[in-house]
């Protein structure tokens, strides 16, 4: 199986491709980044990210794509750019009918290092060991993308089997609204004729 990992970002979008199969060592195919200038319009930057990812999809022909899930950060502008670049990667994969795995940073760290609290240096070190590389891939965004690809290589097939085994949830439709019934008014007491006792 060949997986393209995408560490989304507007300034640097990390990309990493690995090959692997159950019981064999994963192999590096390619790693790098797509860069966009910080001063450019967001639309132009997203187009550059899309063009870069598209070129990688054409060149490396992955079987699946793994994208980092956006998590909450204090810097809203950073979160927005990351989310937008991630959405571009997901859309490009969907256009090619490629399965997409979404993983949080802690899921990726746990898959690669055994600890969801690992730092970037530990992730880079383990990616280097797992892929049998001579040095840590640079920049860190490329190493993170490779970690995403490795995470999907190991977890993706199991998650797909779980989804396939789970019974399909019935589609619930809202019940049609029924008009509220009014309870009948109690009848007014009969009036007695004047002078009746």
Curated annotation (Swiss-Prot):
Its EC number is 3.1.21.10. Its cofactor is Mg(2+). Mg(2+) 2 binds at residue 68. GO terms for molecular function: crossover junction DNA endonuclease activity; DNA binding; magnesium ion binding. PROSITE patterns: RUVC (PS01321). Gene3D superfamilies: Ribonuclease H-like superfamily/Ribonuclease H (3.30.420.10). GO terms for biological process: DNA recombination; DNA repair. PANTHER family: CROSSOVER JUNCTION ENDODEOXYRIBONUCLEASE RUVC. HAMAP family: RuvC. The RuvA-RuvB-RuvC complex processes Holliday junction (HJ) DNA during genetic recombination and DNA repair. Endonuclease that resolves HJ intermediates. Cleaves cruciform DNA by making single-stranded nicks across the HJ at symmetrical positions within the homologous arms, yielding a 5'-phosphate and a 3'-hydroxyl group; requires a central core of homology in the junction. The consensus cleavage sequence is 5'-(A/T)TT(C/G)-3'. Cleavage occurs on the 3'-side of the TT dinucleotide at the point of strand exchange. This is Crossover junction endodeoxyribonuclease RuvC. The gene is ruvC.
């Amino acid at each position: 199986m060949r997986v393209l990992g995408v560490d989304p970002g507007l300034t640097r979008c990390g990309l990493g491709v690995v090959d692997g199969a159950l019981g064999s060592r994963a192999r590096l195919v390619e790693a790098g980044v797509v860069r966009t200038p910080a001063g450019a319009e967001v639309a132009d930057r997203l187009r550059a990210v899309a063009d870069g990812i598209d070129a990688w999809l054409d060149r490396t022909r992955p079987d699946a794509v793994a994208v980092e899930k956006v998590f909450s950060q204090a810097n809203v502008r950073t979160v927005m750019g990351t989310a937008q670049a991630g959405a571009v990667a997901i859309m490009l994969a969907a256009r090619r009918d490629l399965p997409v795995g979404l993983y949080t940073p802690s899921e990726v760290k746990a898959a690669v290092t055994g600890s969801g609290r690992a730092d970037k240096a530990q992730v880079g070190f383990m990616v280097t060991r797992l892929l049998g590389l001579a040095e840590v891939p640079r920049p860190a965004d490329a190493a993170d993308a490779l970690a995403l690809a490795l995470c999907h290589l190991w977890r993706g097939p199991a998650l797909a089997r779980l989804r396939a085994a789970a019974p399909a949830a019935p589609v619930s439709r809202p019940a049609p609204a029924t008009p509220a019934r009014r309870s009948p008014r109690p009848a007014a007491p009969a009036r007695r004729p004047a002078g009746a006792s």
